């Protein structure tokens, strides 16, 4: 029985469709470089993020990038992986691996680093198909230092002065005060003496004193005699004397109860002489 053979053009077309750029370059038999891990020494403060960079050039579809930490027994402990390995749910979420946009660099970060995170770290690349290969990077060290509390900046206290210098300062201050007091007394004495001299000079010369706001006012008392001239009174013209009119009444008291005698009247208009009265008639006369 003869096996049918595919025509050559069909085989050529299948080969063209199945080929992609770099397929031969990514051959598993071709040697590839191990990843790089930097920086070699990373020092951070407690509570800050610590970030390493792992660079891997052979990023084919079938690879895994792991992040390791060396244990005290010199064994590798897997912290995180890219792509993320969901088969190990107990991993610490503080350790993260993130691919950068260029596709070859990966950030491996410790979020909020602790003091016990200090140690040795490295990254490892695993190629799965068609043959598994594992290559590790060089090791790097992480140091997490203690965070110190920020002490508020205090103003430097002045250095203590010696006792002799303090006594000198006190003596200087007291001397300055005494000197100021003496100067003030001298100024007041000069002002008062000048004011007194000006007062005496003004009294001697008879000139009025000029007002001095700084001088003490001095009061003087002068005694004199006041002379009032007598002014004679102007004689007034004589006033004509008008004779006063006086009326006289005579009351005659009769001697008997049954007899009566006529009364006599006199006035100033009549004659001045009065008629004689009888002795038996009692009478009293007074001016009206």
Swiss-Prot record:
Disulphide-bridged cysteine pairs: 54-123
Record's bilayer topology term: Single-pass type I membrane protein
Pembrolizumab binding, as annotated region: 74-99
Residue ranges constituting the Ig-like V-type domain according to the UniProt record: 35-145
Motif (ITIM motif): 221-226
Annotated signal sequence range: 1-24
Interaction with CD274/PDCD1L1: region residues: 70-77
Main localization of the protein described in the UniProt heading: membrane
Keyword annotations: Adaptive immunity, Apoptosis, Cell membrane, Disulfide bond, Glycoprotein, Immunity, Immunoglobulin domain, Isopeptide bond, Membrane, Phosphoprotein, Signal, Transmembrane, Transmembrane helix, Ubl conjugation
Annotated Pfam families: V-set (PF07686)
Glycosylation sites: 49, 58, 74, 116
InterPro entries: Ig-like_dom, Ig-like_dom_sf, Ig-like_fold, Ig_sub, Ig_V-set, PDCD1
Record topology, Cytoplasmic segments: 192-288
Annotated segments matching region Nivolumab binding: 25-34
Regulation: Inhibited by pembrolizumab (also named MK-3475 or lambrolizumab), a monoclonal antibody that prevents the interaction with CD274/PDCD1L1. Inhibited by nivolumab (also named ONO-4538, BMS-936558 or Opdivo), a monoclonal antibody that prevents the interaction with CD274/PDCD1L1. The interaction with nivolumab is not dependent on glycosylation and depends on a loop at the N-terminus (N-terminal loop, corresponding to residues 25-34).
Record carries keyword Mitochondrion: no
GO molecular function: signaling receptor activity
Any single Gene Ontology cellular-component annotation: external side of plasma membrane
Single Gene Ontology BP annotation: regulatory T cell apoptotic process
Effect of residue 210 to R: Does not affect ubiquitination by the SCF(FBXO38) complex
Residues joined by cross-link Glycyl lysine isopeptide (Lys-Gly) (interchain with G-Cter in ubiquitin): 233
Modified positions (Phosphothreonine) in chain numbering: 234
Disease linked to the protein: Autoimmune disease with susceptibility to Mycobacterium tuberculosis: An autosomal recessive immunologic disorder characterized by lymphoproliferative autoimmunity and onset of various autoimmune diseases in early childhood. Death from autoimmune pneumonitis may occur.
Subunit composition and interactions: Monomer. Interacts with CD274/PDCD1L1. Interacts with CD273/PDCD1LG2. Interacts with FBXO38; leading to ubiquitination and degradation of PDCD1 by the proteasome.
Functional summary from the UniProt entry: Inhibitory receptor on antigen activated T-cells that plays a critical role in induction and maintenance of immune tolerance to self. Delivers inhibitory signals upon binding to ligands CD274/PDCD1L1 and CD273/PDCD1LG2. Following T-cell receptor (TCR) engagement, PDCD1 associates with CD3-TCR in the immunological synapse and directly inhibits T-cell activation. The PDCD1-mediated inhibitory pathway is exploited by tumors to attenuate anti-tumor immunity and escape destruction by the immune system, thereby facilitating tumor survival. The interaction with CD274/PDCD1L1 inhibits cytotoxic T lymphocytes (CTLs) effector function. The blockage of the PDCD1-mediated pathway results in the reversal of the exhausted T-cell phenotype and the normalization of the anti-tumor response, providing a rationale for cancer immunotherapy.
The name this protein goes by in its record: Programmed cell death protein 1
Organism: Homo sapiens (Human)
